[in-house]
Amino acid sequence: MDLCDHPLVGKLISLGLERGDFVVAGSGPLLAHGLRSSVGDLDIVARGDAWKRATELADPVPAPSGYGLMVLLFDGGLEIFDRWLPGTPGPDALIAGAEWIQGLPFCPLREVLEWKRTALREKDLKDILLIQKHLDREVLDHE
């Protein structure tokens, strides 16, 4: 799947954010790996110029987690955070650890799996199974 064809990814690209200053988190990495064909929104962790650009487009509000701030764009289709979830690495570490897929930075699936297992929300259960199955296949392919 060409990520640029996905409407939310197209909106993200349209912002012109500095690619070294953000990473796609949440369920976005599942989209990038072809594990999901759709997502309700894209969660972005941003710093520096990317965060500054986001705050020029809309006023930051408290994040639902109560940890940090977020900017909602495109009717909530893009949620840009100044940090990720409590107990996770800061923006610098998340961005440094990104894997690049089709020119965009995504959080590695192993990290996404950890977060989703910790949160263990109803909506995460299917994603946990999809990621685990994918990672198990990767291990088998490399043996």
Label each residue range with its predicted role:
Residues M1-E143:
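Compositionally biased terminal segments of proteins
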